Amino acid sequence: MANNMREIKSRIKSINQMRQITKAMKLISASKLKKARAQLEETLPYYNKVKETIADILAHSAEVESRFFDIREEKEGKKKAYIVMAGDKGLAGGYNSNIFKLTEHEIGDNKENALLLVAGTTGRSYFSRKEYHVHTEFDYAVQNPTVFRAREITEIILDLYNKQEVDEVYIVYTQMISAISLEPRILKLLPIEISALREDVKADEIVLDQRLKYEPSVTEVLNVLIPKYIKGIMYGTFVEAFTSEQNARMTAMDNATKNADEMLQKLNLYYNRARQATITQEISEIVGGASALE
């Protein structure tokens, strides 16, 4: 009985220590999530204005030619680049595994024509182990999303696209629909679909003058604006992925803390019962010994 009590007491101590860790991780994730959301809200107006300007040009220009709108002719074996935004750490429920599943499903049997740019050490390890072509790795990019890092990745993919080393570029990330709903998504980045961009910016949001002239030409202006637009999407999805990961980890740690509380409640009950049984046994032995002396 005494050995059993010592074992229960040891388990209570271990679970208490684990509970302190999970509770601390939950609080850290909540703080990071709040900071990232504020960071995104500060930068969104600028990138929204860039998007509106591009939509205005498309709305008021007869024909627009740009390599970024170049829908390259259909062919077998199209080279596709995937920017995969995974986490640098685990303990976030199904956050990372859902991203991996979506990426593999999207690539399908076209593995030899898929080129990956992976943000996050978990993604790098997973896809390298599966023998995918990992072109570039970005450690701690999602953990610390910055405009500088978004520009760095944008320059790499634009270089690949302009050299026609890839025909299409996609971003795979997790969108936070709500505090309790996360959805892995895939977004086509290049080439830009003009119809989708026009639909994305409603007509009443375009406030620029129709008679506005762009110098030296519409094409040249677009070639300057579109990389900024892509960088904005890149940064926005980085922050979205970061907030989703923190939310997933916060939820996972909250559930772990609750499970620890339930286990502690049961173990304390077992410990008290064992202690009560020990005391009862000791009393019985004392009473039995006293009776034997009479």
From Swiss-Prot:
Pfam annotation, one family: ATP-synt
Membrane topology: Peripheral membrane protein
GO molecular function list: ATP binding; proton-transporting ATP synthase activity, rotational mechanism
InterPro entries registered for this protein in UniProt: ATP_synth_F1_ATPase_gsu, ATP_synth_F1_gsu, ATP_synth_F1_gsu_CS
Subcellular location: Cell membrane
NCBIfam families for this protein: ATPsyn_F1gamma
Protein known as: ATP synthase gamma chain
